[in-house]
Amino acid sequence: MNDSLKSRGIMLVISSPSGGGKTTISHLLINELQNDLVRSISVTTREPRDGEINGKDYFFVTEPEFINLCNTNQMLEYAKVFGNYYGIPRKFVTDNIANGVSVLFSIDWQGAFKLIDIMREHVVSIFILPPSMEELQRRLYNRSGESDVINKRLGEAAFEISHCYRYDYVIVNHDIEQSVYQIKCIFTSEKLKTQRRVSLKQFIDNCIR
């Protein structure tokens, strides 16, 4: 985003039910906004899997190190899942925001609401809806084909969708490219908001001297 005024980054939070397009859209956004947007990298205590790189896929730490990060307020939020800790490092997020780089979070509604409660000033939240439950069912069938799995995910999807009203924006994903375009428009608009233009006062002062 070329601009003579410096802007703070945002925390771009994207949620959708399984099959809604969140993962694909997130990958495309990172590719198309690569100078302005980075993927959130979590801290975890689990062992690295083959091919995973520390600092790219996760920040890998020991459990005592993780607990120390929590006790010293260096984690925005965290949880224990299947015996391993996962969390969002505060410094990674705040440093990027201060440098004008936005951070993308592709997370469920529970994680989204935690970030909204903690960092409301910086969060821009978007919920992605499927065009219809029939279309969502078709997408899930193409993934799995197992009726039990599909029915379970459709039930979960209805519950997840019921939380969309708290998001800043809601997009209906008829077409991936159109959805990416809409989110990029939101991204640009949010970055241009007055409260995020950190060099605005200096710019105005120079203009009216």
From Swiss-Prot:
Q: What is this protein called?
A: Guanylate kinase
Q: Name one GO cellular component term.
A: cytosol
Instruction: Please report the stretch or stretches of sequence annotated as the Guanylate kinase-like domain.
Output: 9-188
Q: SUPFAM superfamilies, per this entry?
A: P-loop containing nucleoside triphosphate hydrolases
Q: What gene is it encoded by?
A: gmk
| Species this protein is from | Ehrlichia chaffeensis (strain ATCC CRL-10679 / Arkansas)
Enzyme Commission numbers on file: 2.7.4.8
SMART domains named in the record: GuKc
- What high-level taxonomic lineage is stated for the organism? Bacteria, Pseudomonadati, Pseudomonadota, Alphaproteobacteria, Rickettsiales
Similarity remark: Belongs to the guanylate kinase family.
Q: Where in the cell is it found?
A: Cytoplasm
PROSITE patterns documented for this protein:
GUANYLATE_KINASE_1, GUANYLATE_KINASE_2
- Which InterPro entries does the record associate with it? GK/Ca_channel_bsu (IPR008145), Guanylate_kin-like_dom (IPR008144), Guanylate_kinase (IPR017665), Guanylate_kinase_CS (IPR020590), P-loop_NTPase (IPR027417)
Tell me which HAMAP family the record gives.
Answer: Guanylate_kinase
**Mind telling me which Gene3D superfamilies this protein's record contains?**
Guanylate Kinase phosphate binding domain, P-loop containing nucleotide triphosphate hydrolases
Q: Which reaction does it catalyse?
A: GMP + ATP = GDP + ADP
Broad class of where this protein is predominantly found: cytoplasm
